[in-house]
Every structure is written in C-alpha cells, then in structure tokens.
C-alpha cells in the first residue's frame, strides 16, 4: 500500500506529541516517516542478508511507515508509561499521575530532562538554540551565565538551585537563559 508522511505521523502517534498545549497537533518537518521507514527497511534487509548467508534461505522483508514513526516516538511513549506512576515534572504544562495522555508540550524536552528552545543573541528571527538543562551541568552553567544576566548568585538562587525548583520555576530559568 502507498503511505503518506503526514498520515503516518498521525497514525504512528507523532502528531499527538507535537504542538502546543490546548492547540492543534503539528506534523514535524523532519520527515520522520520517510526516513524512519528507510532506516527500518535497511535494518530488515541487513538481517535478511545475514540470515541468507548463514542458512542459505532468503526472507521476505516488509516495513510499514506507521511502525517506523512509532519506533521514533518511543521517548514520548515511555513518558506515557511514566504517567501511570508519577507526574512528568520536566514538562512546562501540568501533568499528574494517571492523567492518561502525554500533553502536547511545545518545545519541552520530555524524557525526564528540562529542555526548551531559547531565542539567543543577536535575537534575529532565526537565532534559536535548544538547551537541555541537566542536573549535572546546572551549577557550572549558572555560574557562567549568572554575572552576564545580572544574577551573580544564579547557581544558589532558591527558585533554581535544585532540579525540583527549576521545574517549578521554568519560565524564570528560560527567561534568564534567553538573556545570555
């Protein structure tokens, strides 16, 4: 059967994870269905060739674009499983244990880490960087940027010192990072 990228993204679950809260889902421009299907086909063909070399028997290899998309969405699917046990504190939108669906969360990182797109210098229309703020790097990052954003005590700011604090005060953290 023929497959179409945007339909595969919808059926494979990718669209349910993109977009902004309370808004329409988005298809990604990255063409994950086309590329993901090709990658999965290549893996299947290599496995079939290995089988043929070992046994002399060939195999029929079939891939579905929707399956390729689903595999590439595995982090969001893991977040869906995590929601059965806990809130997802890295999201900038509220989550709670047992809520069901992973929220469309704009540029939030998911997967347990705080992340977002930051408008950076010189603040032109295409001057963006994606930042993931892991616990292991926060102190060094805060000490580096703090003085430049007129917040020399950023590393020890009670709103931002610990990961739980940064989760509660993400808007403040992203705002300061955006000034850097």
Q: What are the residue ranges of the model-derived segments?
A:
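Active-site-adjacent "lid/gating" segments in soluble enzymes
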Residues: 1-128, 132, 140-143
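Aromatic-enriched alpha-helical interface/lid elements that frame and gate functional surfaces
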Residues: 114-180
């Amino acid at each position: 059967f023929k497959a179409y990228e945007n339909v595969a993204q919808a059926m494979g679950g990718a669209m349910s994870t993109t977009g902004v809260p309370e808004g329409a889902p988005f298809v990604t421009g990255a063409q994950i269905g086309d590329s993901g299907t090709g990658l999965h086909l290549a893996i299947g063909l290599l496995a079939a060739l290995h089988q043929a070399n070992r046994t002399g028997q060939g195999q029929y290899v079939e891939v579905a674009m929707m399956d390729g998309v689903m595999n590439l969405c595995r982090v969001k699917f893991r977040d869906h499983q995590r929601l059965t046990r806990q809130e997802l504190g890295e999201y900038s939108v509220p989550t709670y244990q047992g809520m069901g669906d992973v929220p469309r969360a704009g540029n939030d990182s998911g997967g347990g880490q705080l992340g977002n797109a930051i408008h950076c210098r010189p603040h032109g229309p295409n001057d963006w960087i994606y930042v993931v703020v892991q616990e292991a790097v926060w102190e060094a990052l805060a000490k580096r940027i703090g003085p430049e954003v007129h917040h020399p005590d950023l590393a020890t700011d009670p709103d931002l010192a610990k990961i739980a604090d940064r989760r509660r005060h993400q808007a403040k953290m992203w705002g300061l990072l955006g000034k850097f």
